C-alpha cells in the first residue's frame, strides 16, 4: 500500500520536500516563504475535505507571517531560526490570540484566547508561519480523533482508517503534504501513536523541557508538548525551537536544552557501534498483530547490523501501567476540567432565567462535554472520593513509582529501549468506538513513558506485511537525554534508506 497523498497527489513539489530542504531554499532566496506557505495552503484546500486534519486554517495570518520573514531576509537579516519561513500546523490545544482554540470541544467552540501559549510564542519568534489549528480528540482524550466534537481525521494511507489520537490531525497533515512541520501533545502517546500510524516521526520530550503554559490541560503530570515531522532531522530542528525553561510554567525544568540537532546530524552516518539497545520483553510477545511484530523484529535486526548490541530487558511493572494510567489520568482530568463551568469563558447553555447558577453550570457541562470526557470526569471523581482515594489513586501512584524504577534499572544495562509503538496498525474508524477498553489498550506501549516522565520517539519502521500499513518503532531514552533519541533515530532512519 502507498500513501497517494504524498506519492501521487502533490502537484506542487514544495509540499513533498523536508522542512530542512525548504529552509535551505528560503534562506538562499531560491524561493520565498510566501511561495512555500501558499503551496501548503493550496494543498490544504485541495485535500482537507478528504483528510479533515484542520479545524481552523489561518490563511491571512500565515501569509502575513511569511511576508515578514521574506522582508527581513531580503533586507539582509539573518534568519530568526533554522526553520524561519517554513510553515507549521499547530494542534488545537495551544492557545493563540489570532485563531480560535477549541481543544476540539463544543465547550470552547469559537473561544479566542487573550494570550499565546509559550510554544506558540516561540514558534512566532522563530519566524515559522502557522498554517492553522489541527483536529484532535476532545481535550486530548482518545486514541483515534473520533472523540472530536467536529468529526474524525482520516488516515492518508487509507481514508477508512484512523490517523491515531489524540493528535491525529497534526500527523495526518504531515502525511498528506499539508504541512512540513507540526506540533502535538503527548499525555499517553498522543504524538507517538499517530506518528506510527501515518509513517511520520513524533517525539515526546522529557517532561518539563517544553513549556505547558497556554496548553489546555488534560492531565498536568502527564501532558507534554512536542514536535512531529516527516524526518528525524526536521523533528530535531523543531524540538530545538520549542524547548527550554519557562518561568510561566511551574513544572518547567531550568536546564540546558539537549543538543538534539547536533545528535540528529551525527546519527545520520548510520553508525550504531557501541550503542546498547534494550528490547522490552513485555512489549514483544503474542497478542500483537503479526505484521507489527515482524516489522519490529526486522528493525531490531537492522540495528544489530548497524553495530548495536541488542539486550533483552525485563520491566515487570509495565504490565500494570495501563490500569495505573487510567486511574491517574481521570483523577487529574476531573480536577482540571472543573474550570469549564460556563461562568467565565466558553460555552454557557441553559441561562434563560429559569435555572439557578448551579443548574446552569450542570446543564452547560452536560451540553459542552462529549461522552468520553464525561466518562473520564466521572471515573476520576469516583476514584478521588472518600473511601476510594487510598484504594485506587494512591495505589496507582505506587505503581507509577515502580514503573519509573523499572526504567531506571533498565538504563543501568542499556543506552536506549525499543518496542513497537502500537500493538496493531491503524484500525478502521468506528471499529473500537463502542469499546473503551479496546481503545485504551491501543496505548499500551506508549503510556509507561509518560508515567515516568521520560523521552520517547516513534519513527517509521516499514509497512506491515499483513495490512500494508505503516508500523512505528518506539525509542525510549532516560530523562533529559532526548539527544539519544535523535542520534539513534537518525542512524536507524539512515539505515533504512
Curated annotation (Swiss-Prot):
Presence of keyword Membrane: no
SUPFAM superfamilies with a match to the protein in the record: Amidase signature (AS) enzymes
PROSITE patterns: AMIDASES
Active site, renumbered: 91 (charge relay system), 166 (charge relay system), 190 (acyl-ester intermediate)
GO cellular component: glutamyl-tRNA(Gln) amidotransferase complex
E.C. number(s) listed in UniProt: 6.3.5.7
Pfam families the record matches: Amidase
Residue numbers spanned by region Disordered: 143-171
Top-rank taxon: Bacteria
Catalytic activities: L-glutamyl-tRNA(Gln) + L-glutamine + ATP + H2O = L-glutaminyl-tRNA(Gln) + L-glutamate + ADP + phosphate + H(+)
GO terms for biological process, alphabetical: translation
Matches recorded under Gene3D superfamilies: Amidase signature (AS) domain (3.90.1300.10)
Key words of the record: ATP-binding, Ligase, Nucleotide-binding, Protein biosynthesis
InterPro entries in the cross-refs: Amidase (IPR000120), Amidase_CS (IPR020556), Amidase_dom (IPR023631), AS_sf (IPR036928), GatA (IPR004412)
Molecular-function annotations in GO: ATP binding; glutaminyl-tRNA synthase (glutamine-hydrolyzing) activity
Family statement: Belongs to the amidase family. GatA subfamily.
Function field: Allows the formation of correctly charged Gln-tRNA(Gln) through the transamidation of misacylated Glu-tRNA(Gln) in organisms which lack glutaminyl-tRNA synthetase. The reaction takes place in the presence of glutamine and ATP through an activated gamma-phospho-Glu-tRNA(Gln).
Subunit structure of this chain's protein: Heterotrimer of A, B and C subunits.
Record-given protein name: Glutamyl-tRNA(Gln) amidotransferase subunit A
Name of the gene encoding the protein in the UniProt record: gatA
Amino acid at each position: 500500500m502507498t500513501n497517494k497523498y504524498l506519492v501521487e497527489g502533490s502537484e506542487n513539489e514544495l509540499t513533498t520536500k523536508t522542512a530542512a530542504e525548504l529552509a535551505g531554499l528560503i534562506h538562499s532566496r531560491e524561493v520565498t516563504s510566501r511561495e512555500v506557505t501558499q503551496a501548503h495552503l493550496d494543498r490544504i484546500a485541495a485535500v482537507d475535505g478528504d483528510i479533515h486534519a484542520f479545524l481552523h486554517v489561518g490563511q491571512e495570518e500565515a501569509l502575513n507571517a511569511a511576508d515578514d520573514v521574506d522582508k527581513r531576509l531580503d533586507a539582509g537579516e539573518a534568519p530568526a531560526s533554522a526553520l524561519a519561513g517554513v510553515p507549521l500546523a499547530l494542534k488545537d490545544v495551544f492557545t493563540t490570540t489570532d485563531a480560535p482554540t477549541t481543544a476540539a470541544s463544543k465547550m470552547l467552540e469559537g473561544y479566542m484566547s487573550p494570550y499565546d501559549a509559550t510554544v506558540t510564542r516561540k514558534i512566532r519568534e522563530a519566524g515559522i508561519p502557522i498554517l492553522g489549528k489541527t483536529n484532535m480528540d476532545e481535550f486530548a482524550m482518545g486514541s483515534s480523533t473520533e472523540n472530536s466534537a467536529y468529526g474524525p481525521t482520516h488516515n492518508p494511507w487509507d481514508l477508512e482508517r484512523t490517523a491515531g489520537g489524540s493528535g491525529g490531525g497534526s500527523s495526518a497533515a504531515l502525511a498528506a503534504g499539508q504541512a512540513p512541520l507540526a506540533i502535538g501533545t503527548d499525555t499517553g502517546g498522543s504524538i507517538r501513536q499517530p506518528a506510527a500510524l501515518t509513517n511520520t516521526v513524533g517525539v515526546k520530550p522529557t517532561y518539563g523541557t517544553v513549556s505547558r503554559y497556554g496548553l489546555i490541560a488534560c492531565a498536568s503530570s502527564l501532558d507534554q508538548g512536542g514536535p512531529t515531522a516527516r524526518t528525524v532531522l526536521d523533528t530535531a530542528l523543531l524540538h530545538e525551537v520549542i524547548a527550554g525553561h519557562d518561568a510561566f510554567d511551574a513544572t518547567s525544568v531550568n536546564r540546558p536544552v539537549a543538543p538534539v540537532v547536533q545528535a540528529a546530524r551525527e546519527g545520520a552516518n548510520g553508525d550504531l557501534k557501541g550503542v546498547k539497545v534494550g528490547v522490552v520483553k513485555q512489549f514483544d510477545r503474542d497478542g500483537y498483530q503479526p505484521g507489527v511484530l515482524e516489522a519490529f523484529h526486522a528493525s531490531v535486526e537492522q540495528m544489530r547490523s548497524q553495530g548495536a548490541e541488542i539486550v533483552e530487558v525485563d520491566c515487570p511493572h509495565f504490565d500494570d501501567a495501563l490500569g495505573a494510567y487510567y486511574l491517574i489520568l481521570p483523577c487529574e482530568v476531573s480536577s482540571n476540567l472543573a474550570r469549564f463551568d460556563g461562568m467565565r469563558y466558553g460555552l454557557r447553555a441553559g441561562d434563560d432565567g429559569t435555572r439557578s447558577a448551579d443548574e446552569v453550570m450542570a446543564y452547560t457541562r452536560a451540553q459542552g462535554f462529549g461522552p468520553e470526557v464525561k466518562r473520564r470526569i466521572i471515573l476520576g471523581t469516583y476514584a478521588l472520593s472518600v473511601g476510594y482515594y487510598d484504594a485506587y489513586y494512591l495505589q496507582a501512584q505506587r505503581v507509577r513509582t515502580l514503573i519509573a524504577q523499572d526504567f531506571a534499572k533498565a538504563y543501568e544495562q542499556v543506552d536506549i529501549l525499543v518496542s513497537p509503538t502500537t500493538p496493531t496498525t491503524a484500525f478502521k474508524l468506528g471499529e473500537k468506538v463502542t469499546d473503551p477498553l479496546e481503545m485504551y489498550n491501543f496505548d499500551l506501549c506508549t503510556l509507561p513513558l509518560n508515567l515516568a516522565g521520560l523521552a520517547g520517539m516513534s519513527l517509521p519502521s516499514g509497512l506491515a506485511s499483513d495490512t500494508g500499513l505503516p508500523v512505528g518503532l518506539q525509542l525510549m531514552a532516560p530523562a533529559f537525554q532526548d539527544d539519544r533519541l535523535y542520534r539513534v533515530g537518525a542512524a536507524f532512519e539512515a539505515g533504512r534508506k
